[in-house]
Amino acid sequence: MSHHATSNPDWHGWLCDTLARLREPWPTRWPGLPVVLDACAMQLWRDAEPASEDAQHMLSLARAMTALIETHNAPMPIEPHYHNRLHTADALVSVCGLLRVLQAQGHDTPETWMACLLLAVASHDVQHPGGANAFAQQLEHQSVQVFQELAQEHQLASVWIDRVSQLILRTDPTLVSANHDRVAGRAFVMDLDWSTVLMNEADI
């Protein structure tokens, strides 16, 4: 996932190349979601750890979540066709790319919100059985329950548990249009509403 800095980076080319390289080892030589997550973190923090304690905590929890997903999904004879580990990896890479574009454009991207997004994306389809919701946010609520149990074990601050939970719930496809309407005409600022839009765009 390396990218050489240029005056006009080819972000689309970077994303397409990275997504293609994720597919080369899938599924028989899959390196694991923790490897993908760490590669994204290296891109965003330039090979360093976040300075903020909250961001460190969320990144650590994201690593625990990706490990949990691997433990749950790897033994499956067949994973869900779409909501599988490759999809989660695609979404992680995509939100990483969006954050890097924002950084390159000079936007303020607080590391707490970057870590929050990585954690939310890592968690948004945890133990997804495949298929679609029978009612609004059905499967998203299931993912939130798994996330909250792990977050409480890791003693994540309640404000970030709430924010990550909201981000996961807002990935219900029927809410995407309303999520985008919520920021229409607003300047970009890293908050829950704009982070929701970034997450929706990454959830390809």
Q: Where are the model-predicted features located?
A:
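Short alpha-helical scaffolding segments that buttress acidic/His motifs in well-ordered protein cores
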Residues: 62-73, 117-121, 164-172, 198-202
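Alpha-helical phosphate/pyrophosphate-handling elements in metalloenzyme active cores
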Residues: 34-43, 79-116, 147
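His-Asp-centered metal-binding catalytic motifs of divalent-metal-dependent phosphohydrolases/nucleases
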Residues: 91, 114-130, 143, 166-172
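Active-site flanking loop/helix segments enriched in acidic
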Residues: 64-92, 126-132
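Post-HEXXH active-site segment of zinc metalloproteases
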Residues: 133-146
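Inter-helical turn/loop segments and adjacent helix faces that build the functional surface
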Residues: 102-109, 133-134, 149-161
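Histidine/acidic-rich helix-loop-helix segments that form or flank divalent-metal centers
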Residues: 155-204
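Non-catalytic interface/linker regions that flank or bridge core catalytic/transmembrane domains
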Residues: 1-77
